[in-house]
Curated annotation (Swiss-Prot):
<keyword id="KW-0489">Methyltransferase</keyword>
<comment type="subunit">
    <text>Homodimer.</text>
</comment>
<protein>
    <recommendedName>
        <fullName>Ribosomal RNA large subunit methyltransferase H</fullName>
        <ecNumber>2.1.1.177</ecNumber>
    </recommendedName>
</protein>
<dbReference type="Pfam" id="PF02590">
    <property type="entry name" value="SPOUT_MTase"/>
</dbReference>
<dbReference type="InterPro" id="IPR029028">
    <property type="entry name" value="Alpha/beta_knot_MTases"/>
</dbReference>
<dbReference type="GO" id="GO:0070038">
    <property type="term" value="F:rRNA (pseudouridine-N3-)-methyltransferase activity"/>
</dbReference>
<feature type="binding site">
    <location>
        <begin position="128"/>
        <end position="133"/>
    </location>
    <ligand>
        <name>S-adenosyl-L-methionine</name>
    </ligand>
</feature>
<keyword id="KW-0949">S-adenosyl-L-methionine</keyword>
<dbReference type="GO" id="GO:0005737">
    <property type="term" value="C:cytoplasm"/>
</dbReference>
<keyword id="KW-0698">rRNA processing</keyword>
<feature type="binding site">
    <location>
        <position position="77"/>
    </location>
    <ligand>
        <name>S-adenosyl-L-methionine</name>
    </ligand>
</feature>
<comment type="similarity">
    <text>Belongs to the RNA methyltransferase RlmH family.</text>
</comment>
<comment type="function">
    <text>Specifically methylates the pseudouridine at position 1915 (m3Psi1915) in 23S rRNA.</text>
</comment>
<dbReference type="InterPro" id="IPR003742">
    <property type="entry name" value="RlmH-like"/>
</dbReference>
<feature type="binding site">
    <location>
        <position position="109"/>
    </location>
    <ligand>
        <name>S-adenosyl-L-methionine</name>
    </ligand>
</feature>
<keyword id="KW-0808">Transferase</keyword>
<keyword id="KW-0963">Cytoplasm</keyword>
Length: 160
């Protein structure tokens, strides 16, 4: 069974998001082993110098990369990444399985983005859209898309 890890900066505080995440985690349990890890975000004041922003991203980046093994396929959620349609994402996940990838890790960075080291470690950079979304909401959206991909892959009905 495919192992999927989601490693994200910050804590989810909104109850409605936590409930949605729990629901999709439950649905996904029939298809994958899911592990979700929250990484503490760096405290930062409103205004930071460019150097301070880089320091924050570097510290968060170190924590993001800490638990990722060398064999894991890493997908970074990134505004500058490439977009998928849902069927294309499902096909991509199927291709990873055919290539023998048994562990896929998705990274969701902090509010300032991610460090260069995290970008370098990514095997694929995926953009959901050119729009910016709240990071806690991205976790729910990601789980929904993974669930949709699994349903598509198995030929099971899923609304379009």
């Amino acid at each position: 069974m495919l192992q999927i890890k989601i490693v994200a900066v910050g804590k989810i505080r909104e109850r409605f998001l936590m409930e949605g995440i729990k629901e999709y985690a439950k649905r996904l349990s029939a298809y994958i082993r899911l592990e979700m890890t929250e990484i503490a975000d760096e405290p930062c004041p409103e205004r930071l110098s460019a150097a301070d922003e880089e320091r924050v991203k570097d510290r968060e980046g170190e924590r993001l990369l800490k638990g990722i093994g060398p064999q894991e396929h890493v997908i970074l959620l990134d505004l500058q990444g490439k977009e998928f349609t849902s069927p294309d994402f499902s096909e991509y996940m199927d291709e990873l399985a055919l290539m023998g990838k048994s562990s896929v890790t998705f990274i969701i960075g902090g509010s300032l983005g991610v460090s260069g080291e995290v970008r370098k470690r990514a095997d694929y950079r995926w953009s959901f859209s050119r729009l910016t979304f709240p990071h806690p909401l991205m976790r729910l959206m990601l789980l929904e898309q993974i669930y949709r991909a699994m349903r598509i892959s198995k030929g099971e009905p899923y609304h379009k």
